[in-house]
C-alpha cells in the first residue's frame, strides 16, 4: 500500500538516516527499485518528474502502474509516490491521479507568490492525507528543461516557507542536478546549518544526490537531511550495462534481442545502484 512520505521522513530525521527518493521512468525502473527496497527492508520514495509522467502517458497511468505493481510484487515496506519538481498545475493533476506526496517547486516565483501558492497546496494536501515538499533556492543543473545555477537558499526565506506547514523542505546548498563538474566547490554546510537553525525539526531534502562524495552525504544527514534524491546515477548505470550487453553482441545470440533479456542487465545495474544508496543513506532495515 502506498503511503504519505511524512511518517517515514519524521522517523529518518529522528534516527539520523535518510530515505532515498529514486526517480522512475518506466516499468523496469519501478520494478527494480521496489524489489530492492523490499530486499533491504527500506522505506522508499518513487519520484516522478513532470517530464517522466508525460513520457509514461500521464500521472494516472503512473499511479495505476505503481499501485498494481506494489500489490503484485507483495511489497510490504512503506512506499510513497511523489511528484518531483511539480508545477502548480502538476500538483493538482497528481493529487487527482492518486499520488501520495507532492513537491511544489515555487522557487522561480517571487517569495510572496511562492508563499501564497504553497499555503494553498499545503491545505489541499493535508486535507487528503498527502505529504508536501517545497523548495527555496534553485537547485543547479537541468531537470526536464528547468535550469538552475545551484544557488544557496536564504535561511530566512526557508523559515517563511517552513512555517506554512510543509512536511519537508528542499533548500539549495550548492547542489546540482545531473553530473557534477570537476570544479564544483562542494555542498555549503554553512548554509545547511543556518537553514536548520531557522526551521528546527523539519526533514530537509537534498536534490542532485548523484556524484556527491559519501562523506558529504553523511555530513548532510548528520545536519538534518532526511531525504536524498537520486536519478542521474540510475540512468548512467542502466545505460552503461545496456551498452555493454549490446557491444558484447549478446543481443545477436539466440533471442538476446527480446526486450526482457536486453533490458535485464540494465535493471540489475539499477538495483545495484539503489542498494549502494540505501546502504549509504542508512535506511536499510528501517522499514
Q: In which residue ranges do the predicted regions lie?
A:
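Short catalytic-loop micro-motif centered on adjacent basic/acidic residues
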Residues: 19-23, 81-82, 103, 204-207, ...
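Alpha/beta enzyme core
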Residues: 3-15, 27-52, 57-76, 85-202, ...
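Hydrophobic alpha-helical scaffolding
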Residues: 23, 228, 232, 260-267
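Active-site gating loops and adjacent loop-to-helix segments of metal-dependent hydrolytic enzymes
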Residues: 247-258
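Metal-dependent phosphohydrolase cores
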Residues: 21, 213, 259
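Active-site proximal loops enriched in glycine and acidic residues that flank catalytic Cys/His/Asp
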Residues: 173, 208-210, 232
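Family-specific functional microsites
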Residues: 246, 263-273
Amino acid at each position: 500500500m502506498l503511503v504519505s512520505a511524512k511518517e517515514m521522513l519524521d522517523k529518518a530525521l529522528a534516527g539520523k538516516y535518510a530515505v532515498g527518493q529514486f526517480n522512475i521512468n518506466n516499468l523496469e525502473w519501478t520494478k527494480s527499485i521496489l524489489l530492492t527496497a523490499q530486499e533491504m527492508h527500506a522505506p522508499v520514495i518513487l519520484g516522478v518528474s513532470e517530464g517522466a509522467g508525460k513520457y509514461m502517458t500521464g500521472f494516472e497511468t503512473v499511479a495505476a502502474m505503481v499501485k498494481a505493481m506494489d500489490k503484485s510484487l507483495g511489497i510490504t515496506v512503506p512506499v510513497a509516490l511523489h511528484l518531483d519538481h511539480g508545477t502548480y498545475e502538476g500538483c493538482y493533476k497528481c493529487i487527482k491521479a492518486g499520488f501520495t506526496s507532492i513537491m511544489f517547486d515555487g522557487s522561480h516565483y517571487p517569495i510572496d507568490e511562492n508563499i501564497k501558492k504553497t499555503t494553498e497546496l499545503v491545505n489541499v494536501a493535508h486535507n487528503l492525507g498527502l505529504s508536501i515538499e517545497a523548495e527555496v533556492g534553485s537547485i543547479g543543473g537541468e531537470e526536464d528543461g528547468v535550469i538552475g545555477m545551484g544557488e544557496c537558499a536564504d535561511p530566512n526565506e526557508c523559515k517563511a516557507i517552513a512555517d506554512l506547514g510543509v512536511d519537508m523542505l528542499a533548500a539549495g546548498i550548492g547542489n546540482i542536478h545531473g553530473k557534477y563538474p570537476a570544479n564544483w566547490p562542494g555542498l555549503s554546510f554553512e548554509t545547511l546549518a543556518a537553514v536548520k537553525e531557522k526551521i528546527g525539526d523539519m526533514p530537509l531534502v537534498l536534490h542532485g544526490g548523484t556524484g556527491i562524495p559519501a562523506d558529504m552525504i553523511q555530513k548532510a544527514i548528520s545536519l538534518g537531511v532526511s531525504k536524498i534524491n537520486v536519478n542521474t546515477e540510475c540512468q548512467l548505470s542502466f545505460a552503461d550495462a545496456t551498452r555493454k550487453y549490446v557491444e558484447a553482441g549478446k543481443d545477436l545470440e539466440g533471442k538476446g534481442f527480446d526486450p526482457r533479456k536486453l533490458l535485464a542487465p540494465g535493471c540489475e545495474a539499477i538495483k545495484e545502484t539503489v542498494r549502494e544508496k540505501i546502504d549509504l543513506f542508512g535506511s536499510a532495515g528501517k522499514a
